[in-house]
């Protein structure tokens, strides 16, 4: 795996609140190696460990992107949704930021059928065909289109399972993580002090509740993906 310098700055992470964990009563003992202190009733994450695993994750996504691999970013809670969409669009990744529909990856054939329906309805809307239908039929199909846009809009160009999945908040996206594990899809996961660090292929200990923390971690990963894609374009 390529080793590169990703400008991961501990002071920058502190300013973003990456080090703030959950309350000391709400933690997973398996996170002990990633916790450096307790302060005012909350655990403090060891940012040196965060920097190490974030750097490893950046190396992984850079190498994958340089080989033309596809990524999916998953983060559906309100604090993560906008950052996930922005990061994914910037790096030309697929994303899910509203709700992970059970079986989205393990039952890919059903997801693929929904995506075909979604694309067909988008085409009908763009060509004006929907507006030429009876009002009742048009209204029903427009509702379907709106529903599909909400839940599948971020994966509308996906033609197969992703090569790597990046997950924001292990507990919130546990179903997505379990599906990836079942299928053997490599995962990178932000883990707070209440998570299990042994589930994902690379777990990045970080505050998964603060927007600034989520955005910082995603920005580093996205930069690495973009760098990798540039390398792939230059060396096809």
Swiss-Prot record:
Family recorded in the similarity comment: Belongs to the universal ribosomal protein uS2 family.
A single Gene Ontology CC annotation of this entry is:
mitochondrial small ribosomal subunit
Domain of life from the UniProt record: Eukaryota
Q: What is its main location?
A: plastid
Q: Which GO terms describe its molecular function?
A: structural constituent of ribosome
- Protein keywords: Chloroplast, Plastid, Ribonucleoprotein, Ribosomal protein
Q: What is this protein called?
A: Small ribosomal subunit protein uS2c
- The protein's organism comes out as Vitis vinifera (Grape)
A GO BP term, please? translation
